[in-house]
């Protein structure tokens, strides 16, 4: 996984890692992981951090070494690519770029894709529309897309 990173990325990660490796022993504590990742432009939730730590900290000693950290960052970078794809897809549906997909916009895109769905479009909106405002915002869109 880490072999997909560029030399520049690796040196950027090494620099960030070193900043938090206070005693220079080649390990950072799990508590510091969130700070390191945020400094690199990632924004993991507490739950995501805990999942990452559980995956990486094999011996359960509460520290993460640099090779483990690189694998973790490579995985996160891969996830970020799919996030960009989702944003792009959302923009395609959100014709007026107001941050929401209306039933009319969804119907328009589906028709252009050769789908003649009227009841189905309303049903899709109802399923995805968590806050009940009759439109799909980006968070709702991501939930629907990730559920597939």
Swiss-Prot record:
Can you name a GO cellular component term?
A: myosin II complex
Q: Pfam family example for this protein?
A: EF-hand_7
Annotated Ca(2+) 2 binding sites: 57, 59, 61, 63, 68
Q: Which residues bind Ca(2+) 3?
A: 94, 96, 98, 105
Q: Which UniProt keywords apply?
A: Acetylation, Calcium, Metal-binding, Methylation, Repeat
Residue positions annotated to bind Ca(2+) 1 are: 21, 23, 25, 27, 32
Domain (EF-hand) ranges: 8-43, 44-79, 81-116, 116-148
Q: Name one GO molecular function term.
A: calcium ion binding
Carries keyword Repeat? yes
For binding Ca(2+) 4, which residues are annotated in this chain's numbering?
129, 131, 133, 135, 140
Give the sites modified to N6,N6,N6-trimethyllysine. 116
Q: Does the keyword Transcription apply?
A: no
Q: Which residues carry this modification: N-acetylalanine?
A: 2
InterPro entries per the record? CALM/Myosin/TropC-like, EF-hand-dom_pair, EF_Hand_1_Ca_BS, EF_hand_dom
In its miscellaneous comment, the UniProt entry states:
This protein has four functional calcium-binding sites.
What does the similarity note say? Belongs to the calmodulin family.
Q: What does this protein do?
A: Calmodulin mediates the control of a large number of enzymes, ion channels and other proteins by Ca(2+). Among the enzymes to be stimulated by the calmodulin-Ca(2+) complex are a number of protein kinases and phosphatases.
Protein name as annotated: Calmodulin
